[in-house]
Amino acid sequence: MADAAEDSRALFGAAVRAALEAWPALQIAVENGFGGVYSQEKAEWLGGAVEEYFFRNADLELDEVEDFLGELMMNEFDTVVEDGSLPQVSQQLQTMFHHFQKGDRAALKEMASLITQRKCKVRATALPTAGETDEDDDANSVEEMEVAATNDGAATDGVCPQPEPSGPDSQTIKEEDIVEDGWTIVRRKK
């Protein structure tokens, strides 16, 4: 009887590890070394820690499992999981533990094998930010921006009206001060 209990416990541990290994957020954290040089070892330790957490707390709620996993990811991998996968993984782990508690080894094996079959390799790629773009490309390209100006609630077609002169003292603009872009060069009075 003790052998069957140990075997079930080992099966639950293998199922937990399979679920964690299939978790894209953890895969990305390990692949990119978010946990430092020992990221792989931390991921392996994480499986044992989660398994032990379930054994020490037999009647866990889903949000408790989510919080525990979220804390582990933050503390060990400096990662905040925001892709919506945290509740899914927590639910899988909780379902596995319920199968373990009922002694339903067949369901536990089936669930672990399904997770292993569906496991896919993910890779994170960084998107270039505005500061990382090539400066040569910026100098050679012309960027256009469409602006809709409002004048007393009525939208105009991307053209802002020129300000009206405010009176007879208004400064007259010389034609050479208007650049071809439509910008006006403002000069200080001497």
Swiss-Prot record:
Q: What does this protein do?
A: May be involved in 20S pre-rRNA processing.
In terms of InterPro entries, this protein maps to:
Pre-rRNA_process_TSR2 (IPR019398)
| Start and end residues of each stretch annotated as Disordered | 152-176
Q: What is this protein called?
A: Pre-rRNA-processing protein TSR2 homolog
GO biological process per UniProt: maturation of SSU-rRNA from tricistronic rRNA transcript (SSU-rRNA, 5.8S rRNA, LSU-rRNA)
List keywords of the entry alphabetically.
rRNA processing
Is the keyword Metal-binding in the record?
no
Q: Which organism is it from?
A: Bos taurus
Q: Which family does it belong to?
A: Belongs to the TSR2 family.
Report the gene name: TSR2
Q: What is the lineage of its organism?
A: Eukaryota, Metazoa, Chordata, Craniata, Vertebrata
Q: Name one GO cellular component term.
A: nucleus
